[in-house]
């Protein structure tokens, strides 16, 4: 499994940029795979805690059912122009982030409750009465896409192949 901490150790600058985009936005899109094989896109607010990137699902949600059946995910941090920056978050600059991997359900209910409680307190939201499921991401790829000098810059890291930067005019 490749955790966010593993990624940060391998590529600290790219990890900082990707984390900045995700942490600043209130709006990301998570793609999961439905039972019929078609994609499902869900709005989500991923967060970082204990060296990992986390996502959650509400009790009995379709997203949770998708992840139980097939844990493959894609996460897209919305481009800067179309998103709202969280209060107090640092401006991450231009670009968006795309992450692929597998959602790994946290089976420890006490750890899950602690992580969610800390997160809800941090964002100033009351904890829901019913719990849901909490997942960390086993990273496959992290891509930050930006524009520099009139070129599209695709900065891609893979757990298998490492980092590659491609510039397109």
What residue spans do the PLM features occupy?
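Short, conserved active-site entrance elements at the starts or edges of catalytic domains
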Residues: 5-32
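Charged, amphipathic alpha-helical interaction segments
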Residues: 23, 42, 106-108
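Short beta-strand segments
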Residues: 25-59, 65-67, 74-79, 85-90
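Structural motif corresponding to alpha-helix initiation and N-cap regions
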Residues: 15, 60-61
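Short beta-strand segments in beta-sandwich/barrel cores
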Residues: 28, 53, 73, 103-104, ...
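Short solvent-exposed loop/turn micro-motifs enriched in small/polar/acidic residues
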Residues: 23-25, 38-39, 60, 96, ...
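Charged, gly/pro-rich active-site loop segments
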Residues: 1-13, 80-82, 87-169
